[in-house]
């Protein structure tokens, strides 16, 4: 079973190609509606495609696997001057796997889920940890070299988009739990990243910015005319220390 195409069953967008950043919208609710089997149907494709995702990460000099944005049944990354820079699809497999684990009704079922998916969860997180860059001047980790979810910011000048920061923070913690459940002593390998990930940037009016570098978030139409990504930082994602209270 393949992941659903970007627009689901209503329209035939991009000739039916599925865009992995949209997988969460189409599947996550099943984990909360006591229908985890509906969510898990496409996990086999992820296991199949991870070989190609690993090649992408290796080619770019990263550990683990980097999930492609736009693809098809073959798992090959479709060419794009935007899609290849997106990262918000990366944590989805971790998030959905965690929902599966929480929905499991027995220890045997949970053990089987760990057996099937822990390796892919771990490899997904390895890329995320490697992608986070340490800023020695401010003793923090930052995200850059990416196009945020709203697709209106430039990869070469954007630092710390808020939704992606929140998702990194949440998913790395989930991945650590999967390591612990699998009996892996990781010695807190990702703790430093989780604890020192940059907080969400805000302006003098205490309004969150589309990115730390997007100082004119509320005066430049580029930042207010596409995906409301700021809502995802504390809408899709749970509360965290990155949120200014």
What are the residue ranges of the model-derived segments?
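Long, K/E/R/D-enriched contiguous segments that form extended
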Residues: 2-30
């Amino acid at each position: 079973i393949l992941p659903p195409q970007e627009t689901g069953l209503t329209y035939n967008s991009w000739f039916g190609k599925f865009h992995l950043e949209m997988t969460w919208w189409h599947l996550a609710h099943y984990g909360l509606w006591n229908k985890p089997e509906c969510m898990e149907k496409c996990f086999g494709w992820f296991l199949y495609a991870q070989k190609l995702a690993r090649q992408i990460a290796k080619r770019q000099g990263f550990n683990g696997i980097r999930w492609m944005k736009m693809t098809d049944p073959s798992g090959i990354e479709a060419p794009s001057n935007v899609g290849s820079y997106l990262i918000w699809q990366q944590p989805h497999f971790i998030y959905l796997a965690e929902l599966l684990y929480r929905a499991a009704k027995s220890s045997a079922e949970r053990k089987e889920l760990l057996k099937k998916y822990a390796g892919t969860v771990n490899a997904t997180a390895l890329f995320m940890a490697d992608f986070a860059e340490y800023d020695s001047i401010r003793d923090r980790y930052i995200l850059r070299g990416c196009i945020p979810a709203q697709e209106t910011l430039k990869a070469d000048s954007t630092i710390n988009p808020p939704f992606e920061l929140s998702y990194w923070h949440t998913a790395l913690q989930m991945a650590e739990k999967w390591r612990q459940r699998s009996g892996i002593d990781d010695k807190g390998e990702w703790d430093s990243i989780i604890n020192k990930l940059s907080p969400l940037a805000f302006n003098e009016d205490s309004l969150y910015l589309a990115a730390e570098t997007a100082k004119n978030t509320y005066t430049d139409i580029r930042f207010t005319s596409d995906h409301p990504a700021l809502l995802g930082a504390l809408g899709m994602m749970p509360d965290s220390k990155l949120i200014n209270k």
